[in-house]
């Protein structure tokens, strides 16, 4: 177990720490981009479904409940099945491809039924996060796992600050509202 140091306990210290492991830099960068993209769901889902499909607050609420429930099922059940069948690397690639497909379909669908299909594809793509985190954990020494998880948590926290204004601004720009 390592001693706690204040200079390492911040997002910039996290970046410095993670830069010491070149093998995980691309993985961490992908986690950051995926996290920013995921925050678009939280930030603009209601606006998007109202704008494109004229949904009311009840439909939006139901859709968010479905998103939450399906996400739980994916994380509690599907992740372990896919990890055994595919392994972490292929599961990460599979999940990232599904998420990209889901986002693409969100952007261009004109039909609500396809939106719901895209939502399922997107949610299953959530397996990538677990896979990528597992890969990064396997690269870092055991006595530094806490610092790794803290660093990743710190960076994900930063995306939580950056993404909502970024994504709502993008939505506003492209819809003219």
List the model feature ranges, each with a label.
Residues 57-58, 140-154:
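Loop-to-transmembrane helix entry/capping segments in MFS-fold secondary transporters
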Residues 43-60:
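Short amphipathic helix-loop junctions that connect adjacent transmembrane helices
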Residues 74-88, 171:
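Helix-to-loop junctions at the C-terminal end of transmembrane segments
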Residues 89-132:
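C-terminal transmembrane helical hairpin of 12-TM major facilitator-type secondary transporters
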